[in-house]
Amino acid sequence: MESRVLLRATETVTGVPQLRRPIRAINRQFSTASSSFTAFAKPIGSIGEGGNLISGRQLRPLLLLDSLPEKREILKPVRAASAEGGDSAGETKVGFLGKYPWLVTGILLLMWYFLNVIFNILNKKIYNYFPYPYFVSVIHLFVGVVYCLVSWSVGLPKRAPVNSDILKVLIPVAVCHAIGHVTSNVSFAAVAVSFTHTIKALEPFFNASASQFLLGQPIPITLWLSLAPVVLGVAMASLTELSFNWLGFISAMISNISFTYRSIFSKKAMTDMDSTNVYAYISIIALFVCLPPAIIVEGPQLLKHGFNDAIAKVGMTKFISDLFWVGMFYHLYNQLATNTLERVAPLTHAVGNVLKRVFVIGFSIVIFGNKISTQTGIGTGIAIAGVALYSVIKAKIEEEKRQGKTA
């Protein structure tokens, strides 16, 4: 029909007499063509949105049908059904958790706190009858690696491919992670859990120092001032800590330095891989890093009397069960911390991390009945308050930078 209309338009320009055809014949022919189109044409969308198209051509007869008053009532049910069908096809059904994302975030935070507290308590209980932190650190990573391999085998999540370039950037991160993990456990085994976490509250101070003096990134004076209470509080707590010894103190400080370098290398090792796969690969590499020191430092003692003493105290079943579950709790709480970070703003995660440390210190004191002096308690409180202040200020600065880039 289009070719006929174009032909008539051409003839109209070249020969005006063509217009003398009877009006009734033209109307009859047009109405016949119109009815033939409407017989097979089905409405696809609204006209205003470019709908009612077949092979890219808009069906004009429907416009004429729509313009007739007696036809409008006929078209209303059809349009309503079409709109309902379009809505149902265009929108996916949202589940209960999808409707309430804040509920998912809250559950993740609670699980993160719960698993972290359980890990620290169970970890310290193991050290009370099995004081071999190098070996226990290997068990933490080994159980996590097995968990990752099983998850990959069932496709939850799907394993991301890795190549030599990715390994080059992940290996430094994994080495720092391994050193920080082992030294943290050495400190946990040597002193009270609450004291180790108080020392580890200095980690932001090391991060700021590394950023300022190693990376050349200027740190605002407000951040430095917020770190003063942290240093003061840790110093007060250390001077009167009843479980203080230099091995626990120095190990916790080395852990802070190691995790600081891990943060530096992590910034340089940004990849397109998701966080779950990244943490899995880091755990695998860290496991191989931790194995040699564990064999060299604690291997002979373990074979001589370490395993036998532990089994004699708690039994084989409990010993193996404790090692398995402490490894599971370690891996899961770290994974949940990463997943929570992806769902919330940096400020929320920073405050959550501070509150987590408060929970761990508080529960460890209650569970183990650790006696602390008044000065140690005040110093710990000042240090935690300083970390909270630092975290809030830093998160706000990062948010302002992010908004400035997007503006």
UniProtKB/Swiss-Prot annotation:
The chain crosses the membrane at residues 102-122, 135-155, 213-233, 278-297, 376-396. Pfam families: TPT. Residues 1-79 form a transit peptide. Its main location: plastid. The keyword Transit peptide applies. Keywords: Chloroplast, Membrane, Plastid, Transit peptide, Transmembrane, Transmembrane helix, Transport. Signal peptide: none annotated. InterPro entries: Sugar_P_trans_dom, Tpt_PEP_transl, TPT_transporter. It is a multi-pass membrane protein. GO terms for molecular function: organophosphate ester transmembrane transporter activity; phosphoglycerate transmembrane transporter activity. Belongs to the TPT transporter family. TPT (TC 2.A.7.9) subfamily. This is Triose phosphate/phosphate translocator, chloroplastic. It comes from Brassica oleracea var. botrytis. The lineage of its organism: Eukaryota, Viridiplantae, Streptophyta, Embryophyta, Tracheophyta.
